[in-house]
Amino acid sequence: MNYVELNNGVKMPQLGYGVFQVEPAEAERCVLDAISVGYRLIDTAQIYKNEEGVGNAIAKCGVPRSELFIVTKVWPANAGEEKAYESILESLKKLQSDYIDLLLIHQPYGDYYGTYRAMERAYREGKVRAIGVSNFYPDRLIDLYHNVDIKPAVNQVETHVFNQQLEEQKYMEKYNCQIMSWGPFAEGKNDFFNNETLIEIGNKHNKTVAQVALRYLLQRGVVVIPKSTHKDRMEQNMDVFNFLLTDEDMKTIEKLDTKHTLFASHRDPQFVELILSLK
């Protein structure tokens, strides 16, 4: 396993397992499978409604808590200093843990400055080892950076071969903020798994499209959290540290970048309304 070092010295696995859209009843089994395969970074969120399943897996897996790296996120419905702090305590309870390794603001909406102050408080109290954000465009990230005491360690954003975030990554690096990908397979959009470029490169290395896509991001220093509910695919997604893409491979994959989201713009009024309606 490769690790990245965050801006406060905390080491984070570069490859993890994400539980977005994993049913609460399935989360425990999936996380136990992921941990048994070798995953140590587990990414969840308050809005996923499966923190309890993750917590059950943490309690049952037999792996020391110190060897796991648990990520969760504060949803806008819990924004604001007091409300966010209470929600952090609730997440800790659901996760059956004394601390969260990485806590993120999930969306750049609501009183996220109040939320960030609550996260800083939890950090100072030892309840959180690192704090950061998710879905923050560079302008919002820079503004936040200049107006908080504890600088954001991570920004989790849509990152895959069709939306590579190359320019955005430069800003994150400038502000010592680790880029973390959600949706590394673009949730299958753009006929992702049948992409001829990725198939061709995969054949050359005897690897799958998914493995090539993950390897591309890993070689760019991106943290990735692929999701699968199937144990064999979890194993395949872990099998990406025994080959290297060539410079030519990297340049070829870079040409797939459209520089546009395949999901929704965080500046789209209808999307903002949707996010703020979710509790």
Language-model region placement:
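N-terminal binding-site loop/beta-alpha segment at the start of enzyme catalytic domains
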Residues: 1-68, 185, 279
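Short, acidic/polar
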Residues: 22-34, 79-95, 114, 139-141, ...
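A short, structured active-site edge motif that brings together acidic residues
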Residues: 65-78, 101-108, 135
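CE4/NodB-like, metal-dependent polysaccharide N-deacetylase domain
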Residues: 7, 84-104, 121-125
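Acidic-and-aromatic substrate-binding clefts and catalytic sites of carbohydrate-active enzymes
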Residues: 22-25, 45-53, 77-82, 108-113, ...
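A structural motif
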Residues: 39, 97-100, 128, 152
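Structural motif
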Residues: 33, 37, 94-95, 126, ...
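Beta/alpha (TIM)-barrel catalytic core signal, keyed to glycine-rich beta->alpha loops juxtaposed to Asp/Glu
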Residues: 107-279
